[in-house]
Amino acid sequence: MGFDVLLDQAGSLGRFQILQIAFFFVTSMITYTHILLENFTAAIPGHRCWVPLLDNHTTSGNDSDILSQDALLRVSIPLDSNLRPEKCRRFIHPQWQLLYLNGTSPSTNEPDTEPCVDGWVYDQSSFSSTIVTKWDLVCEFQSLKSVVQTLFMSGSLLGGLMFGRLSDRYGRKAIYTWCLLQTAIADTCAIFAPTFVVFCIFRFLAGLTTINIMTNAFILATEWTVPKLQYIGITLILCSYSIGQMLLGGLAFAIRDWYTLHLTVSIPLFVLSLLSRRLVESARWLVTTNQLDEGTKALRRVARINGKKSAGEILTIEFVRSAMQEELNKAQTKTSVIHLLRAPKLRMIICFLSFIRLGASVPFMGLILNLQDLGSSIFLFQVLFGAITFISRCSAHLIMKHMDRRINQSLFFFLVGLCILVNTFLSQEMQTLRVVLATLGIGTVSAANATFFVHALELTPTTFRSTTAGINNVFSRMGSVLAPLLMTLVVYSPHLPWVMYGVFPILAGLIVFCLPETRNRPLPNTIQDVENDTKESRKVKEEDTFIKVTQF
C-alpha cells in the first residue's frame, strides 16, 4: 500500500487537488442537469383538441363573434368526470343546445365525439414549448413521453458497464474527456432531431456517457487524495449534484422553451471537454497497470503544481518502484473481469454493495413521487429538492469525519426506513407531518448515498474500481425501474408499496455491517490486496511503508 507515501511527497491536498475538485464540481453540476432535463423539456402542459370555432382565426360568423371564448369552448369540447374540458376528445359538431339552461336542455342522445384529428392546442403559461408539444405526445401517444427517460436510463445502465471497464483498461482521463464530448454532441444534436425517434436515439447516446462523467470524477478525486481526506472531494462532488438541481430549476424558470434550455446546458460541456485535457491521469492507476514511467511523470507534475520543488528529485522511477514493489509484482499478472468473479472476498463485497445501492435507489425514487405534494410549482419543487439534498450531503461530510463508514450508513438507512414506514400509516389529513417526514426521508437517503460512494470506492481495488462502480450504477438504475413497478402493488393494498419502500433501506442498513470498515485506511490497489486484507495485514503493510520512507 505504498502509493500514499508517493502522494505525500507530491502533495496530498494542495493546489492541484483543489483545482481538480473545483473542475469536477463544475462539470458534475452541469452534467447532472442532463439527467433531470425531462422534468422540464418533457413536461405535459394543459391541452385540448383544436376546434375551428376557437382556433381557426380565418373563420367568422355571428355566433362566433358574439359568444365568449368560454361559451365556444363549451359547445366544442365535452366535459370530463371532473367537469373540466376533455383533453383528448371533441364534439363532431358544435353543440349549441348546451348553452341553454346551463347545458341541461333535453337531449335524447349523448353528442357524438371524436379524437383530436386536427391536433391540439397547448397552454403556454408554464412552458412555451416542450418535446410533448413538438411531437404531440399526449392522449394515446402520452406513453411515448416515458420512452425518452427509459432510453436515457437504459443508456446509463449499459454505459456504466461498458465505460467502467474501458476506464480501468485505458485510463480515467481519456474516458472522462470522451464522455464529456459525447454527452455534449449527443444532447446538442437532440435539439435538431427531425423526428421523435432520432431524438430518442441521441438521448440514449447521452445516457451512455452521462453517469460515467460523474463516476470518473469520483474515482480521480479519490485516487489523487490520501485516505483520511478522500471523503472531502467525494462530498463536494455530491453537493454539486444538489447545486445542479437548483440551477436547472432556475434555468427552466427563466427559459421556457425546451430547445434553448437543452442548448444552454449542453454548450458548456464542449468547453469543459477541452479543459479536461489539462487533467492529470491517475498515477495510482498508471503505476498499478505497470506504466511506471508515465506514473512517475504524473507524480512530478502534481508535485510541481503543488509547489513542492524538491519532490522532483525524490520522485524518481527507482523511488516509485521501491515504494510500489509489492503492487508492481501483482500487476505483472494480467487481470480481467473473470478474475474479479473468481475472487471470493471481492465478489462478496460487490454483491453487498450492489444490494445496498439498490436499497438506496428504491426509496429515493419512491419519495420523489411523494414529494410532489409539496407544491404545484415544478420549478419550486426542483430548487427545494436540491436544497434538501445539499444540506444532507454537507451533514454527511461532517459526520464522516468523526464516525465509521458502516455505522454512518446504517443510521441513515434506518432513519429513511423509519420515516417511510411512519408516513405510510399517517392519515391524509396530517399533510404537514407527511411532508416533513417525506422531506426528512429524502435528506437522509441522500446522506446515506454520500457515505456509500466513499465506502464503495475505498473497498474496491484500483485495477477494477471503475468496473465495480459501473456495476453499482447498474443496480442503481434497476432500483429506479423497480420503484414505480412496486407502486402497482397498490391494487392489493394502498400501504403495500410504501412498506416495501421502507423495508429496502432497513435491509441495506443491516447488510452494511457485512462489509469491512475502511475509515482512514489505505486504498487497495489490486485484487490480492482485497483478498488478503485484514486489520493485522494492513498494520504490517503500513509499518513496512513507513520503513521504506525513512530509508530515503
Curated annotation (Swiss-Prot):
Name its cellular compartments.
Answer: Cell membrane
Biological process (GO), any one: steroid metabolic process
Q: Which UniProt keywords apply?
A: Cell membrane, Ion transport, Lipid metabolism, Lipid transport, Membrane, Steroid metabolism, Transmembrane, Transmembrane helix, Transport
What PROSITE patterns does the record tag this protein with? MFS
UniProt-recorded Gene Ontology molecular function terms: transmembrane transporter activity
Q: Which domain of life is it from?
A: Eukaryota
Fetch the SUPFAM superfamilies from UniProt: MFS general substrate transporter (SSF103473)
Residue ranges annotated as transmembrane are 16-36, 144-164, 175-197, 201-220, 232-252, 255-275, 349-369, 371-391, 407-427, 435-455, 474-494, 496-516
> What membrane topology does this protein have?
Multi-pass membrane protein
Gene3D superfamilies membership: MFS general substrate transporter like domains
Pfam families from the UniProt entry? MFS_1
Q: Which InterPro entries match?
A: MFS, MFS_dom, MFS_trans_sf
In UniProt terms, what function does this protein have?
Renal transmembrane organic anion/dicarboxylate exchanger that participates in the reabsorption of conjugated steroids, as well as bile acids, driven by an outward gradient of dicarboxylates such as glutarate or succinate. Transports androstanediol glucuronide (5alpha-androstane-3alpha,17beta-diol 3-O-(beta-D-glucuronate)), estrone 3-sulfate, and estradiol-17-glucuronide (17beta-estradiol 17-O-(beta-D-glucuronate)), and taurocholate.
Q: What is this protein called?
A: Steroid transmembrane transporter SLC22A24
Q: Which organism is it from?
A: Oryctolagus cuniculus
